Amino acid sequence: MSRRTERVASLLQHELGAIFQLELPRTPIVTIVEVKVTVDLGIARVYISTIGTPEEQAAIMAHLQEQNKYIRKLLSQRIRHQFRRIPELEFYEDHLYEHARHIEQLLSQVRKAPVDDAETPLD
């Protein structure tokens, strides 16, 4: 990513976080993990993490898709003096934290498992 797209992505991540926190209070807890912007700044891919059951997470994603135009409008009001055109928003669910937590659980199980010395091969 170029320096420009990185700066734009960082700004969008900050502003979207503020929008979710201040202007969309009914939206459940959503963490913006990352924002990736295309080179032409036409599309912003917003990767989010949510807490809850898979059904709740699906409902949150559906809610964000329904509110997409409204969120973009709020974003436009906040950054319109910095951009000629506000990027289209695409929301994606990020499962990185869930995978990391699962790996941690597996590692803790391995650490707790008793080691049978009779079965370990000697070199």
Swiss-Prot record:
GO terms for molecular function: ribosomal small subunit binding. It is found in: Cytoplasm. The keyword Signal does not apply. Coiled coil: none annotated. SUPFAM superfamilies: Ribosome-binding factor A, RbfA. Its main location: cytoplasm. GO terms for cellular component: cytosol. One of several proteins that assist in the late maturation steps of the functional core of the 30S ribosomal subunit. Associates with free 30S ribosomal subunits (but not with 30S subunits that are part of 70S ribosomes or polysomes). Required for efficient processing of 16S rRNA. May interact with the 5'-terminal helix region of 16S rRNA. Belongs to the RbfA family. This is Ribosome-binding factor A. It comes from Chlorobium chlorochromatii (strain CaD3). The lineage of its organism: Bacteria, Pseudomonadati, Chlorobiota, Chlorobiia, Chlorobiales.
